Amino acid sequence: NTYRMRISTLINEAIKVGMSSNSMEGIKSKRTKANLHKPYKNIGLIIDNVRAYNANLHLCALITYGCLLRPHREVRELTWGDFSDDLSYIHLSGNRNKSGRNRIVPVPSYIKDFLVKGNPKDNIFSGKPQPLNQDYFKTLWSRFKRQSNLLEQGQTLYSFRHSGAIEIFKRTGSITKLQKAMGHSSINVSLTYLRGLE
């Protein structure tokens, strides 16, 4: 699908400058399979290992777990301007998250310890206005996974979000509080995060 998207972009540009037809028309996207993200049982140990491996991956994992943001876009694209002045909250506009609604997310103190506020327009990982490339954390996670002996089959960077969701449900016992914290439009979506609950 990624190659199809890139080729389509090139063909669309070629059509703008005079190409007469779109050879990508009629080619369907490959359907992707849903992925089960297995939650972590030993979250502290995994987080410590990630911290020793790479500071950016560690911060991404912490924010994914503690703030329940999606790692590959919502976390990767964070700027210092998305944080409140005291770093206690993250403000995400609707065009920056999957639900399409504005979200205000509390930042736990154990995450604030790793944050040093920078220029409001700068990305928290790159230190520049541009975020890191969209495969940055995917690639970093693959490299970490290869050298780690702690991870189980099905545990991904996204598993930190699932583990955080389970932790919230254990603490509150409320599916509606979990739904609100996750930014889901439906309780049914939030329930899928609890399938790893034991």
Regions found by a protein language model. Name each.
Residues 3, 43, 56-60, 134, ...:
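Short, leucine-enriched amphipathic alpha-helices that occur as contiguous helical runs
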